[in-house]
Amino acid sequence: NAEQSSKLITPLINGTTYYFRVGAVDTSKNVSPLTLEANASPIKGAVYTVKTDTSGDYSDIQSAINATQDIDTVLIYPGTYQGGINYTGKKIVVGSLFLTTGDTAYIDSTIIDGDASSSVATFISGEDSTAVLTGLTLTNGYTTITGGGGIRIENSSPRLKNLKILNSVANVGGGGISCEACDSRITDVVIANNSVTGIGGGMRMFNGSNPELLGVTVSNNTSTLNGGGIAYEGLPASTIEQRLHRVTVSGNRSSEGVGGGIYLYSSIATVTRSFIQDNAASLKGGGLSIEWASELTLENSFVSGNALTNGVQ
């Protein structure tokens, strides 16, 4: 009956995907060997749809964001949308139909193109973990003065998940992502083919940042200076521990610096169940460069095939 087959689960977080396995139990408490797996993502508040034609609430993403209030959702249908977006401090969820279906094909088919004129996504107004960006491809961002060709985060901590951040450029730091004073949780994100003339081809974390990386792939990014893949720049005598779990750092290059894969400067990092492979640096530390009182713990991880020092400096 309905009472026995219904289950109220609370509290749930807006924009978070929950996974369930449903089975049957008979009157003798025997559990059926057959189960049904399902996933769901709760959506609170109003939902604003964005479509490339005129059939949605809006045809451009920023207009939809501007119309939202806290806890609302912007649901983006497949297509390519030109121009960067800015959350402007709002506690909202922005995502593709991946958000409602769990179908990863929507990540590839729903694209925000930065027009090589700005960061593709910007979080600089104190956004916290209730600001979520999910299920999208971000590409063709470009910044000259600030970092973060793909995503710029400053004094904010949005949640980033199930994204692809591709082919973006920065002149300062963080071709893919620049994270300044942020504590973001970054999950199942691909950061690839980005570049920077400064530090951190894929990602740059600095000024007290402490993001958590889970299931992140950082590949084929390039930097002129240090950290072709990822650059961590801690504050002097920093005790903040950077956490990387199930991360793949591969094929990244530092053309005139150190740390082709990962560069640590005055930083503490723990890397677990990860791969650091086939990266290269022109000076030293093809896979990893650890400088200025940095500490690194590697657990159940592989470091191999890196150029110059074949791994750790």
Spans of model-derived segments:
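Right-handed parallel beta-helix/beta-spiral solenoid domain characteristic of secreted/periplasmic
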Residues: T54, K91-T146
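Extracellular beta-strand/beta-solenoid scaffold signature
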Residues: S109-I124, T144-R152, A170-C179, V196-F206, ...
